[in-house]
Swiss-Prot record:
It holds the Pfam family PTS_EIIA_1. The active site is at residue 88. The PTS EIIA type-1 domain is phosphorylated by phospho-HPr on a histidyl residue. Then, it transfers the phosphoryl group to the PTS EIIB type-1 domain. The keyword Cell division does not apply. One of its GO terms (biological process) is phosphoenolpyruvate-dependent sugar phosphotransferase system. The lineage of its organism: Bacteria, Bacillati, Bacillota, Bacilli, Bacillales. One of its GO terms (molecular function) is kinase activity. GO terms for cellular component: cytoplasm. The keyword DNA damage does not apply. Keywords: Cytoplasm, Kinase, Phosphotransferase system, Sugar transport, Transferase, Transport. This is Phosphotransferase enzyme IIA component PtsA.
Length: 168
């Protein structure tokens, strides 16, 4: 009886493979083409990027929000397989101190693919930051067994596959 009350005894299925979807409408680009060496030289990790055509940013995977920067320009998500993704909206947007960004989530929230994360003003980002590009980076690469790009060029938020990850 206690096992049923507290959810014990449930067998949790271990997720080892996940598809990461685009967090925004726009154009998919290789991380090495991002005009910032921190991302292009993969100092933060492997990933991909999207040049957005709209300011609606959604969750690219099912998981838990583990970080939302106080400036609302970046979100960290831990997927069901334990992969930690950073969705970084724009380059040098930290200097905007949250201006032009609205967060729709908080740390600890559970998210599904397509759930709204952030809304941003792309025109303001173009004016005040160096780029609107959105890098999606795997922060704990040691947990990744393999990563296969989907080869998409046009991105639709929450629908277009960016890559498939197999966790170790």
């Amino acid at each position: 009886m206690l096992k049923k009350l507290f959810g014990m005894g449930k067998i949790q299925e271990k997720v080892t493979e996940e598809v990461i979807y685009s967090p925004a409408d726009g154009t998919v680009m290789d991380l090495s083409d991002v005009p910032d060496p921190v991302f292009s030289q993969k100092m933060m990790g492997e990933g991909i990027a999207v040049e957005p055509s709209s300011g609606e940013i959604v969750s690219p995977a099912e998981g838990e929000v583990i970080q939302i920067f106080h400036t609302k320009h970046a979100v960290g998500i831990r997927t069901r397989s334990g992969i930690e993704l950073l969705i970084h909206v724009g380059l040098e947007t930290v200097n905007m101190n949250g201006e032009g960004f609205t967060a729709h989530i908080k740390e600890g929230d559970k998210v599904k693919v397509g759930d709204p994360l952030i809304t941003c003003d792309l025109e303001l980002i173009k004016e005040k930051a160096s780029s609107t590009v959105i890098p999606i980076v795997i922060m704990n690469g040691e947990a990744v067994g393999s990563m296969v790009s989907a080869g998409e060029k046009a991105a639709r938020k929450g629908e277009s596959k960016l890559f498939t990850i197999k966790a170790k």
